Amino acid sequence: MSTLRFHAIKESLKYKPVLVEKTERRSDLFGKNVFNENTMRHYLTKDAFIGVMNAIQFGKKIDRNIADQVASSMKDWALSKGVTHYTHWFQPLTGSTAEKHDAFFETIGEGMAVEKFGGNQLVQQEPDASSFPHGGIRNTFEARGYTAWDPTSPAFIYGTTLCIPTIFVAYTGEALDYKTPLLRALHAVDDAATAICKYFDKNVKKVTSSLGWEQEYFLIDKMMAASRPDITLTGRTLLGHSSAKGQQLDDHYFGSIPNRALNFMRELETECMLLGIPVKTRHNEVAPNQFELAPIYEEANLAVDHNALLMDIMGRVASRHNFKVLFHEKPFAGVNGSGKHNNWSLSTDTGVNLLAPGKTPMSNLQFLTFFINTIKAVNTHEALLRAAIASASNDHRLGANEAPPAIISVFIGEQLTKVLEELEGVTKGKLSPKEKTELKLNVVGKIPDVLLDNTDRNRTSPFAFTGNKFEFRAVGSTANCGNPMTVLNTIVAKQLKDFKKEVDILIAKKDLKKDEAVFNVLREYIKASRDILFEGNGYGESWENEAKRRGLSNNKTTPEALKARISKQSIALFEEMDVMSKVETEARYEIEVEAYIMHIQIESRVLGDIARNHIVPTAVKYQNVLVENVRGLKEIFEEKYNSVSKEQINLIEEISNHIAGINANVTKMINARKAANDIQDIEKKAHAYCNNVKPLFDDIRYHCDKLELLVDDEIWPLTKYREMLFTR
């Protein structure tokens, strides 16, 4: 292994920045490999184009005749670009994308062949559902599942394959992917938000949920990554002493991007442009060899698809540049981990961002309505929102003084807090003309001025308002954005639905005017949501105590957090909003708990293997060198032997203690794992892995990392942190 380590270092030093050819302007490249609206205008008949646009904009069904026309046009377009295969591209609950490629090629007899692709192939396919996570919805012998075309996300060409974004459902109709519940949640929030918008503008017919993700990642040399079994098998380092220099000088964040990494980014951005992914920002992040990529905001379903596609593209482009891209939330101890901030907002088909203040008191009242309802939604469902970002890898990051804590709270800034306090003082019931004027001019009317200079940022907040959007910062870098976006849009949809019901009752039964009813309900929501608002330091112990006093959940581990998924409140929520049935909700819980168990199990096995098969033999080898040295000293320095060999003997003893510590803890870990595996109840098994197996990782790592500081660098088998983080 030490030979492999030094070979990796030697090879990595030979790498030069991979030449990236100059391309056309970004605006000319954008969407060239996407069957987007512009391409459809060229290839589709008028009827087919109208049919597809109605499906995209209004959710109308596409009849089979139109589907055949679309399929034929898609095929012609794809063949003109050298495409040979097509696939239904979907997002099963594995966390990555899935695809099965079929050729357009069909034989027609007499040694002849043609390219064929019809409406049947476009609209529906049948992959094996039993081979993907299904949470008990399907038996292994009940293999049938369906992928069905999602016309709201355009088909695209990836390599020589036409990729058709699809949903993935069981034969019995239950969702087996991230996209299906997301589409349902987006429909729910559209219905609920549009109904509220009609209080303020009768012309609004549709409300769209927007998402702008910020993808953080590490780039390390491909050869060095290959020399680390832990990175290869788990995506992170399970051991390794921190480098003497890490991020303490703050010299990496926004620094000059290294040439190799920059050329990787340039090629990546070209690929993204061709696929219609509107990437805009790139920069160094806080930790060495950590970077960030962010796009322009898009409709949420498309943004989720684009992020899933991007992560796949990044891995392929990184390999061409002799890099390995690490998405794990905490690949290296001692430096910052990676997240994926989800910037979320709602906008109307009339061009209004509902989370941005307007120019009139009425438009500002609309802003406050959506702003306060979002806060109320988070207050009611904070535990479910925490469950939406729970994973074995994100547990390493949350609450680690570099990322938001595991306690969900909302930050809105001092000035907006004052606005809410003033609204809280609104008179109950009817408002006098003077009160209305005061409220509209001096409270609601001044919101744009308040936001102009006073939307400060609090990086310790997991859910923060940043001027014209909410930023969900607790999402992990490996996550499929569909999960948190499904939950967020669902809870907001439910809250808006309840809000409308309460406002309509006040208008009908209390004889209040519309704005009076809105103010009255908002006032009560502000009072009910005080506990979720927090402006202070989320890292402090005092916040944990305060959050407990407020009744907020503090689920620090995934097994704890995921329970909120199957609470009576959550199941009822998803059923009422037609997002997921009870069966689907419970299946997702089971899938996510199983994924947690498997991740910890794999890491445990890999750590035990590295510790016993790589670290201990290396330590013994070095110890033998020291023993021979001590023997030689005894032969040469008979009288002074004790004094001249003292340090070597102490070192031999210290190494022995660490070897004993490794072996004892690995044995404990194996026994704890066996005991956990004997548990049939999946929830109890997850807690056993969390509480009995995982804590031993740190004990084993402690001894291994201490040995790294003691053993001769020439024979140490694993590539070290300083080599991985500072080779560029």
Question: Model-predicted segments: where are they?
Answer:
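Active-site proximal loops enriched in glycine and acidic residues that flank catalytic Cys/His/Asp
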Residues: 66, 90, 118, 295, ...
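Active-site-proximal loop/turn and secondary-structure-junction residues that shape catalytic pockets
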Residues: 66-70, 90-92, 120-121, 168, ...
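Glycine-rich, acidic/polar active-site loops that bind/position phosphate-bearing ligands
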Residues: 143-327, 336-339, 346-590
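Composition- and surface-driven signal marking solvent-exposed, interaction-prone regions
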Residues: 231, 307, 329-330, 356-360, ...
